[in-house]
């Protein structure tokens, strides 16, 4: 049973100047019989969307264009700027030939003179997995908890902000924690993922024992009740799991890193090459390394890459804004499709970005990877071809918003695809999507499609609200942010 309050009918003007009729709904009232509510996506982005992206500041170093490979000169400028406390390394107008492996440290920005003026030109990706540009210096070593305490609530729904633990005395305000639970055989089986077989071979979805985590900070402690800074994006059900809170000491983070106002071109192109982990062509143009936080990529054009931006696990509070991805080659088949943006981190905000180039070059324009913790959000994403999809990729990511896009949105069971990618998303929300929508919900989860005006797959068990009619608020992200900041 779904609860939702419809208010009055409203309208707005679309970007094309057309009048869009909309149903005004109370988004806060949307919940199911278990008490699962829409996740709060207002915490996505740089500084949890509490601050604007940094403005234009004077450059610490200006590097001028010239012939030859400029990798060493640019890296030296980045290193000296970081060593002096941070600042902006500005690339003047022109073309800079570089090689993979440039790294940007904390408090340092690499800024061009505009996407039409400054181009980073690379002719070859050298080593499998070595990005052209990387942000931050962290690694994904295992984090050992300093202490843990079992959660005693029978059920904690999506959107909840409090949990009850056995021993609250151990916790304090400001403590960094993982809301954790290990995948159990009972949970895997109840979701229909225990007996996957492909070509006669058993496929494994989420291995039993693998942790599904939600990184949070304790906001308040009252007895054994903990209030968290961000509402949960995945439910906790004692029937199928043994959830607990794990406190940990935050490793050194890499904040305030930026890449902006430039183009990146790989020629000859790698776009669309058959996916192979040992193939250098699958190295990303930009990679945000673990524990990179409060950083951004904006006003960037990327051409010729198979995979463009990779946001790794334990990356958080990131904004990707006005990023354009140009596919200049058709996609090889058979083989996995390339991706524009790959999300394994949390609190990632992608806005006003899109994919261009060959309309026949099929790709996943934004994906989430295995167990990627929410919230993450994609706003106003544009694609030129209905071959492109916003498509959570594998193994129970959770808390993913897609709104106001013309792309196809797929929240569906991927079954034995890959090596058993199965249910890829829980607590996914498609809001005012104009492209095609196919939304299904896992047995122990829920995904929503609200205000869909494009073609909708009706033979599914996804939760559909106001199907065929757009809704107000036009942006769920903006409405939640205004509510949180008291400006609604």
Predicted features by range, described:
Residues 2-276, 448-488:
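Extracellular "leader-to-stem" segments immediately downstream of a signal peptide or signal-anchor
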Residues 69-70, 94, 102, 157, ...:
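Short, glycine/acidic-rich beta->alpha junctions
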Residues 74-82, 97-110, 120-123, 308-313, ...:
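Short, T/G/N/S-enriched strand-turn elements that build extracellular solenoid repeat scaffolds
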Residues 90, 97, 103, 111, ...:
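Extracellular beta-strand solenoid repeats
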Residues 107, 116, 183-215, 219-220, 255-350, ...:
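Right-handed parallel beta-helix
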Residues 125-144, 160, 239-249, 274-288, ...:
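Extracellular beta-strand/beta-solenoid scaffold signature
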Residues 128, 266, 273-276, 299, ...:
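Extracellular beta-rich repeat passengers
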């Amino acid at each position: 049973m779904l609860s939702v309050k419809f208010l009055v009918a409203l309208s707005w003007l679309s970007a094309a100047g057309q009048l869009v009729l909309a149903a005004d709904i109370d988004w806060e009232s949307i919940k199911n019989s278990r008490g699962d509510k829409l996740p709060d996506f207002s915490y996505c982005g740089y500084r949890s969307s509490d601050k604007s992206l940094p403005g234009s500041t004077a450059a610490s170093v200006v590097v001028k264009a010239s012939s030859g490979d400029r990798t060493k000169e640019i890296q030296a400028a980045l290193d000296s700027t970081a060593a002096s406390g941070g600042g902006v390394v500005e690339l003047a107008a022109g073309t800079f030939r570089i090689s993979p492996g440039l790294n940007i440290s904390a408090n340092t920005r690499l800024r061009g003179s505009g996407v039409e003026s400054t181009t980073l030109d690379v002719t070859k990706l050298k080593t499998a997995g070595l990005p052209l540009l990387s942000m931050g210096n962290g690694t994904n070593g295992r984090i050992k908890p300093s202490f843990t305490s079992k959660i005693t609530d029978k059920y904690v729904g999506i959107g909840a902000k409090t949990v009850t633990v056995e021993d609250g005395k151990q916790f304090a305000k400001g403590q960094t924690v993982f809301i954790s639970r290990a995948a159990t055989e009972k949970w895997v089986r109840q979701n229909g993922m225990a007996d996957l077989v492909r070509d006669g071979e058993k496929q494994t979805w989420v291995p039993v024992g693998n942790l599904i985590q939600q990184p949070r900070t304790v906001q308040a402690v009252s007895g054994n009740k903990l209030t968290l800074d961000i509402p949960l994006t995945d439910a906790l059900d004692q029937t199928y799991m043994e959830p607990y809170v794990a406190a940990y000491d935050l490793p050194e983070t890499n904040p305030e890193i930026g890449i902006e106002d430039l183009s990146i071109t790989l020629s000859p192109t790698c776009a669309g090459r058959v996916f192979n982990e040992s193939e250098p062509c699958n190295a990303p143009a930009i990679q945000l390394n673990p524990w990179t936080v409060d950083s951004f990529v904006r006003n960037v054009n990327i051409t010729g890459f198979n995979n463009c931006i990779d946001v790794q696990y334990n990356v958080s509070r990131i904004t990707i804004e006005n990023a354009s991805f140009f596919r200049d080659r058709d996609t090889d088949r058979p083989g996995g499709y390339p991706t524009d943006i790959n999300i394994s981190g949390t609190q990632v905000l992608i806005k006003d970005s899109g994919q261009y180039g060959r309309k026949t070059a099929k790709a996943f324009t934004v994906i989430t990877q295995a167990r990627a913790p929410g919230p993450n959000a994609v706003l106003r994403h544009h694609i030129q071809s209905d071959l492109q999809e916003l498509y959570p990729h594998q193994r129970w990511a959770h808390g993913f918003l897609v709104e106001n896009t013309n792309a196809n949105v797929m929240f569906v069971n991927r079954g034995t695809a890959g090596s058993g990618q199965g249910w890829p998303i829980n607590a996914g929300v498609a809001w005012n999507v104009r492209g095609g929508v196919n939304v299904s919900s896992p047995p122990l989860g829920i995904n929503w499609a609200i205000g869909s005006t494009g073609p909708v797959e009706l033979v599914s068990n996804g939760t559909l609200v106001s199907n065929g009619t757009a809704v107000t608020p036009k942006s769920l992200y903006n409405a939640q942010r205004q509510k949180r900041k008291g400006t609604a």
